[in-house]
Amino acid sequence: MEKQIDDVLTYKIIGCAMKVHNTLGNGFQEVIYQRCLVIELDKIGLEYLREEEMPIYYDNIQVGTRRADFIIANQVLVELKAMVKLEDVHLAQGLNYLTAYQIEKGLLINFGATSLEVKRLYRKH
């Protein structure tokens, strides 16, 4: 049952992203898509954290921080891009964020291509 609820959540997020991409198309900076996605998430009442900072540790020493674009309903990490094409480094970044934030599922959403590109990410154990 939990998987079904989670799928409903990811479909809602993807639906919001599709609305933004259908309205704006590609060619804008990532921050523009972030701001528009906020508007769409607010319209449907999804709770989210934006640009939530997380410390990164190595050998129990903090070596830096990272910021995920969105954490939605404390269940789905969403990383946005505005690139012509997603590369392996973007997938690796999303997977690393899932580990750092200890979140099981994520979405990598690329607004930069002619068609919206969405990759589902799952944390490795």
Give, region by region, the residue ranges found by the protein language model.
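Nucleic-acid nuclease catalytic cores
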Residues: K81-H125
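A short acidic/basic microdomain associated with nuclease active sites
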Residues: I44-N60
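Well-ordered beta-strand scaffold positions
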Residues: L46, I61, Q75-V76, T114
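Conserved catalytic cores of phosphodiester-cleaving nucleases, focusing on short active-site segments
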Residues: G25, A68-L86, Y97
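Nucleic-acid endonuclease domains
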Residues: F28, D42-K43, Q62, L91-G94, ...
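Solvent-exposed, charged helical/coil patches
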Residues: M1-G45, L116, Y122-H125
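Well-ordered beta-strand positions
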Residues: L49, D69-I71, N110
